[in-house]
């Protein structure tokens, strides 16, 4: 979609509509029906590649403003054909992707889908529409859902919460013009969102109440207590990111009862380094520099 990099794809990115992504900047071409059908089939082929590599599960990313999410959201989908307009139409591409993925997965590959509970900005998908999509995914055979929210090209901090270290991010950008642009306007474009532990829980509980399939809770998990709270609220699984970037052995240390809380302070330095060749925690970098 409009998150693709031409330098990587070696072709002009394609998307549901030709809406510009300022974070690229990316100027995508609107997909033809043939493009859409071909792309849906490619998801199925990817399942076979995953099987060949030894995986027993795949995750379809239908959130965060990437390709499938761009079809679902009225913010990025201005189509006038069978793939735009009503929620049923905007979800048609996801339905076709799920058909291809489930056919390829057969009975030996689990199909997990990451989906939004809200896009996180005015003009995007709100909770009720997202809940309807989740119900569709349950009907279409998803084995589990990862419940998240936010839109990388419009509301990135709704996903992460906290603030983005703009100067750190610009430092690792390779495009000189983007470095200048981000330093000048990044603070206005990337709005802060208040962080608190378990920040998606209240929304996720609405989905838990309405759905019967296994759900994965993600968002603001920094301690054993956080994890226990999610599990006690009938989420079958939890997913973590920043706490494991800070300490990849965090789960094992909790199991051994050596540690019950991550020392991650959610400064988002690790996220700001996404334009570098590595995503690392500043605490670990500082510790290494002292040795």
Where are these regions (language model features)?
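Flavin-dependent oxidoreductase catalytic cores
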Residues: 1-291
């Amino acid at each position: 979609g409009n998150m693709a990099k031409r330098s990587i794809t070696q072709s002009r990115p394609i998307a549901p509509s030709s809406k510009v992504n300022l974070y690229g900047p990316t100027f995508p071409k609107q997909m033809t029906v043939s493009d859409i059908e071909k792309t849906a089939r490619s998801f199925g082929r990817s399942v076979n590649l995953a099987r060949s590599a030894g995986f027993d599960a795949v995750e379809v990313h239908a959130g965060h403003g990437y390709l499938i999410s761009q079809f679902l959201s009225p913010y990025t989908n201005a189509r006038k054909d069978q793939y735009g307009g009503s929620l049923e139409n905007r979800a048609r591409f996801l339905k076709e992707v799920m058909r291809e993925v489930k056919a390829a997965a057969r009975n030996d590959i689990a199909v997990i889908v990451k989906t939004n509970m809200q896009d996180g900005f005015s003009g995007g998908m709100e909770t009720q529409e997202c809940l309807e999509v989740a119900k569709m995914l349950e009907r279409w055979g998803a084995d589990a859902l990862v419940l998240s929210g936010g839109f990388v090209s419009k509301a990135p901090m709704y996903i992460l919460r906290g603030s983005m270290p703009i100067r750190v991010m610009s430092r690792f950008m390779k495009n000189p013009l983007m470095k200048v642009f981000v330093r000048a306007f990044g603070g206005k474009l990337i709005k802060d969102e208040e962080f608190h532990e378990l920040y998606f829980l209240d929304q996720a509980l609405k989905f838990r109440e309405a759905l019967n399939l296994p759900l994965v809770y993600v968002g603001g998990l920094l301690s054993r207590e956080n994890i226990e709270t999610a599990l006690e609220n009938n989420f079958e699984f939890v997913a973590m990111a920043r706490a494991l970037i800070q300490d990849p052995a965090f789960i094992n240390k909790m199991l051994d009862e050596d540690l019950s809380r991550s020392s991650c302070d959610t400064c988002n330095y690790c996220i700001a380094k996404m334009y570098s060749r590595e995503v690392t925690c500043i605490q670990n970098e500082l510790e290494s520099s002292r040795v």
